[in-house]
Amino acid sequence: MIKDILNRYGKYMILGLILVSLPTLQSMGLIRSGTLQSFGTIIFYGIVALGLNVLLGYSGLISLGTAGFMGFGAYMSAFLTMEMGWPFILSMAASVLLPTAIGVLVGLVSLRLSGMYLAIATLAVAEIFRRMFEEFSFITRGFRGMSSEFPSFFGIQFERDQTFVFMVLLLVGLMVLTDNFIHSSVGRALLTMRASEAAAQAMGINLLKYKLTAFSIATAYAALGGILYAHFVRHTSPEVWNLMLSLQILAVIVIGGLKTIMGPIVGSLVVFGIPAIILPRLPVIGGVPGLAMVFNGILVVVVILFYPNGLVNIVYDIKKLVLFIVGKGKGKEKVAK
């Protein structure tokens, strides 16, 4: 049984162990403080992309409202903890549940659409949220934004390193949860619906029910990512939650790999990690404004043209190549004997 668990979830555990070690490496001076901050960004955007991948990768539905629901979760959690004095656990639960409930209501209307019409409808919802963040200044502080603090649990105030480890544990837990969901009967129904809605209906699958399920998961993950953003970055403002962010998260799952669990994490590392950690240190071009956008745009085109299955599959292809070469070498040895 343990062997089966390790075979299925071992890669998620290894990822978690690597990430958990980063605060220790930073305290030893082996990595920079800014690098740890960048990996925090990779984690919460990876969580958001994991939810969007359920919607797009497994259900075939596209949403451009991701940033709006992230912002909703971020603002709500910051307001409840800083202004209302709620414990972090309660504010996190409420800040996931309310955006998810709103997402279900939005889905009841918008999920009767498909393709670009659905994308435009979800984009409109995100823009409504963004305008609310700007105009409802008596709650959101308008363009100044809202400040928040690292989370606290049962009276224990976390600092940045403890918050980072908490986010890693959440990430690994959600990867395991999503893996189980995808391999459940609901996950199989989503894949059937993605392949052919007509065939799914013929099999008795309630399309609206399963579309709402996928949409609510994507919304919940987006809200959770926004909460983690608010309490790790410790500030949220309207200009963060724009269309560009939704497109970047969409790029994450395209680059990382659709219909995979590790793909969103790989994509988040590439889309958010490389521009923050590596590109600024490049000679000559490192300080060019907009370099990250150019890099991500080129990479999306390259991946779509030459590696449509996503960068996460490179590891498996390299493994196959090595096994092929090793096997070929052994074959030659036998012939020589």
What name fits each language-model region?
Residues 1-337:
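Transmembrane alpha-helices and adjacent helix-loop boundaries
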